[in-house]
């Protein structure tokens, strides 16, 4: 009957999502720490360049992340898994918020590689490209209020090379990873925010309520 066919189709889709999520998680779980240079390119819906920047990413599982834009302006996003700091150098402003590990709203947290969380938040498909040398995973958010319509992660020999996402307005952002170093020890101090000493009138906005 129609209803049973619908259930079977749903089950097949769920199994495909979980299978792709497990395959993606298996790759990500090989990496406990990650350091990389990231070239960021954002295009509008017509393919025109909106912004180009260079950032430095440092991550340590489960939820420690340092994302520092170094060009053409300076900005730092840092989390220790409890709080998240955002420092805008030009504005001389620091905002502090409670950390949220919702991977449907923060794509970089996909790199934490928890299969169940990925499958809960995204429909997932996988595809081999360039004669099998590139493995790409395409993720479509399940939540209607997701900030992104579509995301993809590409790997070569298990190393992350590219991450792309598209928002509801058709704006596309591509992150290209280079100088990737995985599973090397990271100084714990990297994930401790230090108030800049060279700023005279630093504005601090603390939204944590801690």
Per-segment meaning from a language model:
Residues 7-11:
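Boundary at the C-terminal end of the N-terminal hydrophobic targeting segment
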């Amino acid at each position: 009957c129609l209803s049973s066919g619908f259930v079977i189709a749903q089950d097949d889709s769920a199994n495909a999502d979980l299978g792709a999520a497990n395959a993606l998680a298996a790759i990500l779980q090989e990496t406990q720490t990650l350091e990389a240079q990231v070239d960021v390119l954002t295009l509008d819906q017509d393919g025109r360049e909106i912004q180009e920047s260079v950032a430095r990413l440092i991550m340590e599982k489960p939820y420690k992340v340092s994302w520092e834009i170094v060009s053409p302006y300076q900005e730092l996003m840092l989390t220790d898994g409890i709080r998240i700091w955002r420092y805008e150098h030009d504005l001389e402003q620091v905002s502090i918020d409670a950390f949220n590990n919702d991977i449907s709203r923060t794509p970089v947290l996909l790199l934490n590689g928890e299969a169940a969380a990925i499958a809960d938040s995204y429909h997932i498909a996988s595809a081999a490209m360039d004669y099998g040398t590139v493995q790409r995973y395409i993720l479509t958010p399940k939540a209607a209020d997701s900030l992104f319509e579509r995301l993809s992660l590409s790997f070569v020999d298990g190393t992350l090379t590219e991450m792309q996402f598209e928002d509801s307005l058709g704006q596309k952002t591509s992150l290209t990873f280079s100088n990737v170093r995985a599973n090397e020890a990271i100084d714990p101090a990297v994930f401790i925010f230090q108030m800049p000493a060279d700023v005279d009138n630093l504005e601090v906005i603390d939204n944590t309520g801690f």
